[in-house]
Amino acid sequence: MTNLRPTDCEEFINDIDGGAFAEQLSYAVSIVASAAMETQKVGVITVQLKFSKSKGAGHNNITVEHKLISNAPLPKGKCVEEHRDKTPMYVNTGGDVSLFAKHTEQLFEVKA
C-alpha cells in the first residue's frame, strides 16, 4: 500500500473493549512490575491481537480479538491473569484502524 496511514496507537488501544483493555493493561503493568521488584524475579505481560474480517458486516469491518496475559512472580510460584474479548472495528481508507469509520461527515454543528 503506497498511501498507508498509520493507526493512532493510543486511540486504538483506548478503543479496544471500550477502554477496558487499556485499564487492564495499565493495572497489569503496575502489578507485574511491583512483583518483579519485590521478588527479584522476571514478570511477563503478553498482548495478543488477532484481526479477522467481520462476518455479515460492511466490507471494511474487522473483528479484533484481544488477549492480555500477565504473569506476576511470587516468592514461590507466579500469579497468572488472562483477559480476552472481541471488539468490532473499521479499516479506514489508507489502512488506519479505528472504532468508527472516519469517512463520515460531522453530524452536528460544531460551535467554537
What positions do the PLM features span?
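Compositionally biased, non-globular sequence tracts
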Residues: 9, 20, 80-81, 100
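N-terminal, Lys/Arg- and Ser/Thr-rich interaction peptides
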Residues: 1-12
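Intrinsic-disorder/low-complexity coil detector
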Residues: 5, 72-74, 87
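Mixed-charge, glycine-accented linear interaction segment located at domain edges/termini
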Residues: 83-112
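Short, structured protein-protein interaction patches enriched in aromatics and acidic/basic residues
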Residues: 37-79
